[in-house]
Amino acid sequence: MPNWTSRPADATFDLHGLTVLEAVTRAEQFLRVQARARPGGVVRLITGRGRGGGGAPIRTRTRTLLKTLREGGRVVADFALEDSEGSFLVRLR
């Protein structure tokens, strides 16, 4: 069976242009809706790589959210930072 990260995403959500709080809130809503609609599906969260020397706060907080939702066991089965480092692939439960 091929690795789940080689599957095309069933849905994509772009967090560009949002504040960190908006991005995390909307990402969680998106993931919960998608987990109900597409159990076992794969979705992409586009965070961007961060600007200049300011780090990547949306990416960092999104990673924390994904870990929390994975540990909770009802929404996220697994996730991976894509090679571009500007998006996550997420396997839903």
Language model: regions and residue ranges:
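Long, charged, low-complexity intrinsically disordered regions
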Residues: 1-93
